[in-house]
Amino acid sequence: MPYTPLGFGVIALPTGDPKVAVVTLFAIDANGKANRSGFDTVFEGNTTYNIEGRLRTDFGGLTGHQLAGGVYSTKTFSSLDQNLRFIIENGAIEQKDHSWAFYYNFDQYLYEPKKGSGQGVGIYGRFGASDGNPNPIHYFYSIGIGGKGILPDRPLDQFGMGYYYMDISNPKFTGPQGTRSFLRDEQGFEAYYNCAVTPWMKLTPDIQFVRPAQKQVIDSSGSVPIIVKDSISTATVLGLRLQLIF
Protein backbone atom coordinates (compact mmCIF):
# COMPACT_ATOMS: atom_id res chain seq x y z
CA MET A 1 0.00 0.00 0.00
CA PRO A 2 1.53 3.37 -1.00
CA TYR A 3 1.80 6.31 1.39
CA THR A 4 -1.19 8.65 0.92
CA PRO A 5 -0.14 11.81 2.83
CA LEU A 6 2.24 14.34 1.38
CA GLY A 7 5.68 14.48 2.93
CA PHE A 8 9.28 15.51 2.54
CA GLY A 9 12.39 13.54 3.39
CA VAL A 10 16.16 13.80 3.45
CA ILE A 11 18.61 10.89 3.42
CA ALA A 12 22.24 11.47 4.40
CA LEU A 13 25.15 9.06 3.89
CA PRO A 14 27.94 10.25 6.23
CA THR A 15 30.49 7.82 4.77
CA GLY A 16 29.07 7.63 1.26
CA ASP A 17 28.23 3.95 1.76
CA PRO A 18 24.60 3.18 2.76
CA LYS A 19 25.72 -0.15 4.24
CA VAL A 20 27.93 1.65 6.78
CA ALA A 21 25.82 4.58 7.99
CA VAL A 22 22.49 6.17 7.07
CA VAL A 23 20.62 9.12 8.60
CA THR A 24 17.05 9.92 7.53
CA LEU A 25 14.67 12.76 8.34
CA PHE A 26 11.03 12.89 7.27
CA ALA A 27 8.12 15.28 7.74
CA ILE A 28 4.64 14.02 6.83
CA ASP A 29 1.26 15.73 6.69
CA ALA A 30 -0.70 14.03 9.49
CA ASN A 31 -4.05 15.03 7.93
CA GLY A 32 -3.43 13.32 4.61
CA LYS A 33 -6.21 11.08 3.29
CA ALA A 34 -6.29 8.52 0.50
CA ASN A 35 -9.35 10.08 -1.15
CA ARG A 36 -8.06 13.67 -1.19
CA SER A 37 -5.27 15.29 -3.20
CA GLY A 38 -3.66 18.72 -3.11
CA PHE A 39 -1.85 20.86 -0.55
CA ASP A 40 -4.85 22.09 1.48
CA THR A 41 -3.74 20.50 4.76
CA VAL A 42 0.05 20.62 4.40
CA PHE A 43 0.54 23.89 6.29
CA GLU A 44 -2.15 23.48 8.95
CA GLY A 45 0.38 22.48 11.62
CA ASN A 46 -0.58 18.83 12.02
CA THR A 47 2.72 17.26 11.05
CA THR A 48 4.53 14.06 11.99
CA TYR A 49 8.34 14.11 12.12
CA ASN A 50 10.66 11.11 12.07
CA ILE A 51 14.43 11.01 12.45
CA GLU A 52 16.46 7.79 12.32
CA GLY A 53 20.09 6.74 12.20
CA ARG A 54 21.67 3.36 11.44
CA LEU A 55 25.35 2.46 11.92
CA ARG A 56 27.27 -0.70 11.08
CA THR A 57 29.59 -1.82 13.88
CA ASP A 58 32.56 -4.16 14.14
CA PHE A 59 32.77 -5.11 17.82
CA GLY A 60 35.33 -7.86 18.31
CA GLY A 61 35.72 -8.14 14.54
CA LEU A 62 32.08 -9.28 14.22
CA THR A 63 29.46 -7.48 12.12
CA GLY A 64 26.58 -5.74 13.86
CA HIS A 65 24.26 -2.77 13.53
CA GLN A 66 22.90 -0.07 15.85
CA LEU A 67 19.73 1.85 15.00
CA ALA A 68 17.89 4.59 16.89
CA GLY A 69 15.01 6.82 15.93
CA GLY A 70 12.28 9.09 17.17
CA VAL A 71 8.81 10.17 16.06
CA TYR A 72 6.95 13.33 17.08
CA SER A 73 3.52 14.47 15.94
CA THR A 74 1.86 17.84 16.51
CA LYS A 75 -1.59 16.45 15.73
CA THR A 76 -4.43 16.23 18.27
CA PHE A 77 -5.58 12.67 18.98
CA SER A 78 -8.40 11.02 20.92
CA SER A 79 -7.37 10.23 24.50
CA LEU A 80 -7.23 6.59 25.56
CA ASP A 81 -8.99 7.47 28.83
CA GLN A 82 -12.53 8.80 28.66
CA ASN A 83 -14.98 10.05 31.30
CA LEU A 84 -18.72 10.05 30.67
CA ARG A 85 -19.14 13.29 32.65
CA PHE A 86 -16.59 15.05 30.42
CA ILE A 87 -18.34 13.77 27.29
CA ILE A 88 -21.76 15.00 28.48
CA GLU A 89 -20.47 18.40 29.62
CA ASN A 90 -18.43 19.09 26.49
CA GLY A 91 -20.37 17.21 23.85
CA ALA A 92 -17.18 15.55 22.68
CA ILE A 93 -14.62 12.99 23.78
CA GLU A 94 -11.41 14.07 25.52
CA GLN A 95 -8.42 14.86 23.30
CA LYS A 96 -4.64 14.72 23.71
CA ASP A 97 -2.28 17.19 22.04
CA HIS A 98 0.86 15.82 20.39
CA SER A 99 2.40 12.36 20.54
CA TRP A 100 5.95 11.01 20.61
CA ALA A 101 7.83 7.72 20.43
CA PHE A 102 11.44 6.54 20.59
CA TYR A 103 12.89 3.24 19.37
CA TYR A 104 16.23 1.43 19.39
CA ASN A 105 17.27 -1.74 17.54
CA PHE A 106 20.48 -3.72 17.42
CA ASP A 107 21.78 -6.90 15.83
CA GLN A 108 25.16 -8.47 16.51
CA TYR A 109 26.92 -11.56 15.24
CA LEU A 110 28.38 -13.76 17.96
CA TYR A 111 29.86 -16.19 15.45
CA GLU A 112 30.74 -15.13 11.89
CA PRO A 113 33.02 -17.53 10.01
CA LYS A 114 33.38 -15.21 7.00
CA LYS A 115 32.51 -11.52 6.92
CA GLY A 116 29.81 -10.59 4.45
CA SER A 117 28.72 -14.18 3.85
CA GLY A 118 25.49 -13.83 5.84
CA GLN A 119 26.32 -17.01 7.73
CA GLY A 120 26.82 -17.36 11.46
CA VAL A 121 24.89 -16.90 14.69
CA GLY A 122 23.78 -13.62 16.16
CA ILE A 123 21.44 -11.91 18.57
CA TYR A 124 19.08 -8.97 18.16
CA GLY A 125 17.05 -6.74 20.41
CA ARG A 126 14.52 -3.94 20.22
CA PHE A 127 13.21 -1.35 22.65
CA GLY A 128 10.53 1.26 22.16
CA ALA A 129 8.91 3.88 24.37
CA SER A 130 6.08 6.34 23.85
CA ASP A 131 3.96 8.86 25.72
CA GLY A 132 1.50 6.10 26.62
CA ASN A 133 -1.48 8.29 25.75
CA PRO A 134 -2.63 8.64 22.99
CA ASN A 135 -0.23 5.87 21.92
CA PRO A 136 -1.57 2.61 23.44
CA ILE A 137 1.84 0.86 23.41
CA HIS A 138 3.78 2.51 26.24
CA TYR A 139 6.88 0.30 26.10
CA PHE A 140 8.02 -2.51 23.81
CA TYR A 141 10.83 -5.00 24.37
CA SER A 142 12.07 -7.91 22.27
CA ILE A 143 15.14 -10.11 22.13
CA GLY A 144 16.10 -13.11 20.07
CA ILE A 145 18.75 -15.23 18.44
CA GLY A 146 19.11 -16.48 14.89
CA GLY A 147 21.56 -18.10 12.55
CA LYS A 148 22.28 -19.40 9.09
CA GLY A 149 24.53 -22.16 7.80
CA ILE A 150 25.88 -23.27 11.17
CA LEU A 151 25.91 -26.94 10.08
CA PRO A 152 28.73 -27.73 7.62
CA ASP A 153 26.51 -29.76 5.30
CA ARG A 154 23.49 -27.40 5.59
CA PRO A 155 24.82 -23.98 4.41
CA LEU A 156 21.39 -22.61 3.44
CA ASP A 157 19.42 -23.62 6.55
CA GLN A 158 18.29 -20.83 8.88
CA PHE A 159 16.78 -20.74 12.36
CA GLY A 160 15.52 -18.16 14.79
CA MET A 161 13.66 -17.65 18.03
CA GLY A 162 12.51 -14.52 19.80
CA TYR A 163 10.47 -13.15 22.67
CA TYR A 164 8.56 -9.86 22.90
CA TYR A 165 6.71 -7.95 25.60
CA MET A 166 4.38 -4.98 25.14
CA ASP A 167 3.57 -2.73 28.09
CA ILE A 168 0.07 -1.57 27.18
CA SER A 169 -1.44 1.73 28.31
CA ASN A 170 -4.77 0.28 29.35
CA PRO A 171 -7.64 2.45 28.01
CA LYS A 172 -10.05 3.35 30.80
CA PHE A 173 -13.67 4.48 30.72
CA THR A 174 -15.23 6.12 33.76
CA GLY A 175 -19.02 6.00 33.93
CA PRO A 176 -21.88 5.52 36.40
CA GLN A 177 -20.61 2.04 37.31
CA GLY A 178 -17.06 3.18 38.00
CA THR A 179 -13.88 2.92 35.96
CA ARG A 180 -13.34 -0.01 33.63
CA SER A 181 -10.19 -1.06 31.80
CA PHE A 182 -10.16 -3.23 28.72
CA LEU A 183 -6.63 -4.44 27.96
CA ARG A 184 -3.55 -5.97 29.58
CA ASP A 185 0.13 -6.28 28.70
CA GLU A 186 0.89 -8.61 25.79
CA GLN A 187 3.77 -11.04 25.33
CA GLY A 188 4.74 -13.77 22.90
CA PHE A 189 7.42 -16.18 21.71
CA GLU A 190 8.21 -17.62 18.27
CA ALA A 191 10.67 -20.21 16.99
CA TYR A 192 11.26 -21.53 13.47
CA TYR A 193 13.66 -23.61 11.42
CA ASN A 194 14.00 -22.92 7.71
CA CYS A 195 15.15 -26.10 6.00
CA ALA A 196 16.56 -25.79 2.47
CA VAL A 197 15.32 -29.00 0.85
CA THR A 198 16.97 -27.72 -2.33
CA PRO A 199 18.40 -24.26 -3.14
CA TRP A 200 14.98 -23.37 -4.59
CA MET A 201 12.66 -25.17 -2.14
CA LYS A 202 12.51 -24.22 1.55
CA LEU A 203 10.31 -25.78 4.23
CA THR A 204 9.76 -23.92 7.52
CA PRO A 205 8.03 -25.35 10.60
CA ASP A 206 7.07 -22.62 13.05
CA ILE A 207 5.56 -22.36 16.54
CA GLN A 208 4.17 -19.28 18.28
CA PHE A 209 2.83 -18.61 21.77
CA VAL A 210 0.88 -15.36 22.23
CA ARG A 211 -0.89 -13.98 25.28
CA PRO A 212 -2.93 -11.19 23.66
CA ALA A 213 -3.59 -7.73 25.01
CA GLN A 214 -7.34 -8.34 24.86
CA LYS A 215 -8.40 -9.97 28.12
CA GLN A 216 -12.17 -10.24 27.60
CA VAL A 217 -14.57 -11.05 24.77
CA ILE A 218 -17.24 -8.36 24.57
CA ASP A 219 -20.43 -8.59 22.49
CA SER A 220 -21.25 -5.08 21.24
CA SER A 221 -24.09 -6.08 18.92
CA GLY A 222 -26.77 -4.99 21.39
CA SER A 223 -27.54 -1.63 22.96
CA VAL A 224 -25.42 -2.53 26.00
CA PRO A 225 -22.03 -4.29 25.61
CA ILE A 226 -21.97 -7.69 27.33
CA ILE A 227 -18.91 -9.65 28.45
CA VAL A 228 -19.35 -13.11 26.94
CA LYS A 229 -15.96 -14.46 27.98
CA ASP A 230 -14.18 -13.15 31.05
CA SER A 231 -10.69 -14.46 30.31
CA ILE A 232 -8.71 -15.06 27.12
CA SER A 233 -5.91 -17.58 27.52
CA THR A 234 -2.57 -17.87 25.73
CA ALA A 235 -2.82 -19.03 22.12
CA THR A 236 -0.54 -21.62 20.54
CA VAL A 237 -0.11 -21.44 16.77
CA LEU A 238 1.64 -24.10 14.71
CA GLY A 239 2.64 -23.34 11.16
CA LEU A 240 4.31 -24.96 8.17
CA ARG A 241 5.43 -22.86 5.19
CA LEU A 242 6.69 -24.01 1.82
CA GLN A 243 8.63 -21.57 -0.37
CA LEU A 244 9.42 -22.20 -4.03
CA ILE A 245 11.94 -19.83 -5.63
CA PHE A 246 11.69 -19.40 -9.40
Residue ranges and their predicted role:
Residues 1-53:
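Aromatic- and glycine-enriched pocket-lining scaffold segments that form the walls
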Residues 8-12, 51-57, 104-108, 143-147, ...:
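Residues on the lipid-exposed face of transmembrane beta-strands in outer-membrane beta-barrel proteins
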Residues 15-21, 56-65, 111-121, 149-158, ...:
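Short loop/turn motifs that connect adjacent beta-strands in outer-membrane beta-barrel proteins
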Residues 23-29, 66-72, 121-129, 143, ...:
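Transmembrane beta-barrel strands of outer-membrane/channel proteins
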Residues 30-105:
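Surface-exposed beta-loop-beta
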Residues 34-40, 77-85, 134-139, 171-177, ...:
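Outer-membrane beta-barrel translocator domains and adjoining extracellular loop/strand segments
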Residues 41-43, 96-97, 129-140:
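Solvent-exposed loop/turn segments connecting transmembrane beta-strands
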Residues 230-246:
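Outer-membrane beta-barrel "beta-signal"
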